[in-house]
Amino acid sequence: MARLTKVYNTDDDDSGYVGRRNLPLVAGDKLMMLMDLNSKGLVIDSPLIRGRELEEFSRKFKLLTEAERRQSLEIDSASFMEVLNQCVQCVGCRRRVERLFHQLTETGHRTLDPLELRPTATLGIVEEKLKTPQALGTLLYRHHEVLNNLLDNKLRNKTRCVLHSLDAFRAKPFSETWREVWSAMKSNCRNELTIIETKELHDVLENYLKKHKFCSGCRTKIERAYKILIGEISSKEKGYAAQLYAHIRKCVPDQHIHVTTNKIEFLDALIKRAEPEVNGSYSKLRERHAKTLEIAQEEVLTCVGMIMYERLRRIYVSLREEERACQVLAAVGVHALCRSFDTFVEQKQGISNLELLYQEISRAERAKQIKREQKKLKKKKKKDEKKNLLHRQCDDTEANESDEEEEELRNEELDLEEESQMQHEELSDPGADDGIVIEAARSPEPEPELTSKPTKSKPKKQSKKKKQKKAAFTKMGNQKQMQATARVQPLDADHDQLDVASCISSSIAKTVGDKCEECLASMPNCPCEQDVRDSGYGSDPPSHAGSRTSSAISSPEGSEVSCSDGLCNHDVHDEDSDDLLFYSHQSQLDHKFSLLQMWDDFDEYDDKDEETYYIPQEVVMAFKCHREQVQRKREELRAKLRANFERLCVQHGVQTQVQKSKRTTSALVGQ
């Protein structure tokens, strides 16, 4: 806040008081104070420009001659008012700036130095600022930003500023802000402000008594307290409180009183006592009383506080308004002068600032576009390098996997060759056919596949690997079959070796005349044979409980097993039954020949009866018979389960859906 440095009356000539950046301020009816803006400064004050800003303004400064510069930096009142109406939205600020403009034009005060308002109603710049480009450029530097920052304190959704809004004093009471204006005043201003004329105090007291309708007795006490204050009556009255008037000094010859300025607490108490009266907070409580002289003294102090409140508030509002008006006038004036200067520069250089700005923006955009393209190319190059690196890694992975697959296949072939050599050695052994059973060689366990990174060519590699493995196993099977054939042929050609097939067929042909291997009885009288031929449903004979053949219970299942094993005596013996009997006897010989020989015999049997794979009719009929029995038993079990469930529900008191439906049906029938 600006300082109040001097106080004088309105009748005095202020030409000798008002200096640079000083402005007279109305403080009362006949009281004037001098506002000093040197301590606060104006918004147009800024540090000297240097560097690029100075070079740019120097170029514009040199384009114009001295006469053109003078002409460009001088505007009339009409141009100023037009710019003012465009920039300032608050009506109160505009009216105050207009009054200040005309006031400074008439008086010629240098309040806005280096701006000057001439008697011709024109706004210009002092001669010193026009000589150097640095001084002039500093004054015109960032004028638009300065104006926007100054006018940016208006309320939201309102055109008035905070100072000229109706809510300016409602938000914060003056009793909390009066210290600001009190601290901005010098001692001479404070002393002059605290002088109260007795006539003024008496008028305020009369209005106060009429407002609150004091009774005659109370009015008398208040008037006596007033006369004691101004010194008309002696203070030796009954009930007088001297401490209430302790900080008020009376001047009887001059007919005024002085409020002590060094007692801030006393002033604060006076203002807080008077604030409800000034704001109208006690308007509903109009009737007041002063029963004692002490209460009457307090009522007189309330009137003194009302006078001080009005004076301080008037100075506070005037000081803030004049200070803001000076700031706005200076900012708008610099803005208007700068616009006029730029117009002359554009006319001289033949191109407007807007076009220059467009060219500068275009250059910046082109630079950004080039930078984006370079960044895009760099990113694309980096992406291509990454892609090539991935391709190389994939190729290396494929090569490694192919090498691993080849090595794995090579190992499998070596294992197969070793197994074939072992089988060849076993078959070439002369005692290999003397009832010794050759166990099947264990198939080589497949080695776990080597894990590799998932690539797009993995399905192709897997299919290729499967084909190679399949070809290898096919080749191995063909080699084994060829080796087995080559080994069986010497056995058939050699008459000294035992032919297993001929032995089996000769033993089948002599089954009637031979003896039973179990009980050593003749075959027609063999009880084992009779048990086998028995296809009834009797129990197992106890006399042959230890027999292996009669250990199976004579039942339909046992009969079917015996029939499937070729042990049944059918009337018609076809080739199929002979073959089944052949293989059943072959299984009873405890496998006294090699696996390769059994495989060759099965291949010959499969070649002869290639089209005999079908389900016999007896098996189909037995399945149907069992199916009907199973279905019937299932229905019986379901009915039994349902009956048990309903019985349990009845026992536990639970009503089932069937019982509900039965009750509903019975109810409908009853109706």
Swiss-Prot record:
One GO location term (cellular component): nucleus
Compositional bias (Basic residues): 373-384, 455-472
Ranges annotated as biased composition (Polar residues): 476-486, 546-557
Biased composition, class Basic and acidic residues, residue ranges: 385-395
Composition-biased stretches (Acidic residues): 396-420
Region spans: Disordered: 372-489, 532-562
Protein name: Gametogenetin-binding protein 2-like
